[in-house]
Amino acid sequence: MTNVLFIKANGLPAERSVSVALYEIFLAEYKKSHPDDNVTELDLFEADLPYYDVTMMSGLHKEVAGETLTPEEKRLADIANGYLDQFLAADKIVMAFPLWNFSIPAQFLTYLFYLNQAGKTFKYTANGPIGLVTDKKIALLNARGGIYSDGPLQSFEMSLNYVKNVLAHFGISEPEMVIVEGHNAKPDQAKDIISAGAKEAAELAKIF
């Protein structure tokens, strides 16, 4: 059985969020097209995601070094490792997220920090880091109200680019993508822009 992890990185309802609308469309179509797959949903706005602070970092580093952790270090390290284990156990992963203030929501950033662990998702070598997660299929569903694919705001796009770079660091270099942009910049075209993205998400879900 194929294990599929759906990650939603937006707490708004679908009628107020294009990325959540894409998520729900993709999820519904995927379940319809792949009825035998084991689907797990992770809502990062409902999940327990402690801030990636010095105590958590210390605990994770002590684990690698084989040192004794304090109770709080162990508690936080266990949380991070729990999310990482879930990520690594999935055969396919779908991530839906917006561009907020040129970046990604803080909850999503924290989650990605949990995953970025040497010896688990990548390893250091004399020639630089090498990704260790090369066996996963990834779909990225990204929405941004402005135009960031080209033009004066291109260099400000640090949501999709950031996530793609993190995944490439893990060894996942060719994710599937559905990008919806410009629906706020071009309100007269918003309905058509969002409709086209929804159709693209549904079609990708069928073959993902």
Curated annotation (Swiss-Prot):
Ligand binding (FMN): S17, V18, S19
Domain of life (superkingdom): Bacteria
Gene: azoR1
Pfam families associated with the record: Flavodoxin_2
Alphabetical keyword list: Flavoprotein, FMN, NAD, Oxidoreductase
Family: Belongs to the azoreductase type 1 family.
Subunit field text: Homodimer.
Names of required cofactors: FMN
EC class (word): oxidoreductase
NCBIfam families reported for this sequence: PRK13556.1
EC numbers on record: 1.6.5.-, 1.7.1.17
Name the UniProt record assigns to this protein: FMN-dependent NADH:quinone oxidoreductase 1
Bilayer-spanning residue ranges: none
An MF annotation (GO) of this entry: oxidoreductase activity, acting on NAD(P)H, quinone or similar compound as acceptor
Function of the molecule: Quinone reductase that provides resistance to thiol-specific stress caused by electrophilic quinones. Also exhibits azoreductase activity. Catalyzes the reductive cleavage of the azo bond in aromatic azo compounds to the corresponding amines.
Note describing how the cofactor binds: Binds 1 FMN per subunit.
